[in-house]
């Protein structure tokens, strides 16, 4: 496991910590955290500036005290999804490429790693000693708890960042991407997956959707290595069928059963030309490299590869 203590900073004043008696103390006397030990949830330090956070410290601690049960349910839900949806063909291909191309001496950051993302299990096994992972809730899969809008790392700390199915759940995606840019070394790599044609999931903590062009715009400070859909029109239809029957019968159980009946729809993605899947895909991936110069608005418009022409 990587020793990440040398790259950690206070989330409030952005200065380094001093380690005292197995705790981390901010010694900046102008900081709101001055001489205040970081709180812990079980064995995980919490690097959050609660003066600039979406929920109060009290509510946050209450949420995390009960989050294990919530996350077990989410894990069960993901297990069911793995049966119905299988693994995205594109995700599997992308992860294989990442494994084959990644240097085993580089630092890897996983943003939102409380649950190991689809297709990432093998990646974790291959690069376990290189990965630093955090999320907003307690999980055995993470090294600590932090806010992706305000990452507790020094500039230029990582060689590679993975953020999978997270950006739709943050309040300010552009801010999170700017933080990724900040903590990545020059020419560092990013791999992101975000949904497009998916209904609301995780209730009040679901905020955004991105087209492929919108995803590209979000990462306009990065050179595009590869981009595309991770689930096509068939997968999008499968999502809609679940929510249609859930609403029609006021029953999530019936919605899940409908997915079991129509699981085969996801294989139709393979029969549909890419340009149509881009216009109605379930989600998109972006693999890129950090660059100093932003791409222009015209380049974002020209990036479109869907079926519609003007």
Where are these regions (language model features)?
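S-adenosyl-L-methionine-dependent methyltransferase catalytic module, highlighting the catalytic core
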Residues: 174-175, 179, 189-310
């Amino acid at each position: 496991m990587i020793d990440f203590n040398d790259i950690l900073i206070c989330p409030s004043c952005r200065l380094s910590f001093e380690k005292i008696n197995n705790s981390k103390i901010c010694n900046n006397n102008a900081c709101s955290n001055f001489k205040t030990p970081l709180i812990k949830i079980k064995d995980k330090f919490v690097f959050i500036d609660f003066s600039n956070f979406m929920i109060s410290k009290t509510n946050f601690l209450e949420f995390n005290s009960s989050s294990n049960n919530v996350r077990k349910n989410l894990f069960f839900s993901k297990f069911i999804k793995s049966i119905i949806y299988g693994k995205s063909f594109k995700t599997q291909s992308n992860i294989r490429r990442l494994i084959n191309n990644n240097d085993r001496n580089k630092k890897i950051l996983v943003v939102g790693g409380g649950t190991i993302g689809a297709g990432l299990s093998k990646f974790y096994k291959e690069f376990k000693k290189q990965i630093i992972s955090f999320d907003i809730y307690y999980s055995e899969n993470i090294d600590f708890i932090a806010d992706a809008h305000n990452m507790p790392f020094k500039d230029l700390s990582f060689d590679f960042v993975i953020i999978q199915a997270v950006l739709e759940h943050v309040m300010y995606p552009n801010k999170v991407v700017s933080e990724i840019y900040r903590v990545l070394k020059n020419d560092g790599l990013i791999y992101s997956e975000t949904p497009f044609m998916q209904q609301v999931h995780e209730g009040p903590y679901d905020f955004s959707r991105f087209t492929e062009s919108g995803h590209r715009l979000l990462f306009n400070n990065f050179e595009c290595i590869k981009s595309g859909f991770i689930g096509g029109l068939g997968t999008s239809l499968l999502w809609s069928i679940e929510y249609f029957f859930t609403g029609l019968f006021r029953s999530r159980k019936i919605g899940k059963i409908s997915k079991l009946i129509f699981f085969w729809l996801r294989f139709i993605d393979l029969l549909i030309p890419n340009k149509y899947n881009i216009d109605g895909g379930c989600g998109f991936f972006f693999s890129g490299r950090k660059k100093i110069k932003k791409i222009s608005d015209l380049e974002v418009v020209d990036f479109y590869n869907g079926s519609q022409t003007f």
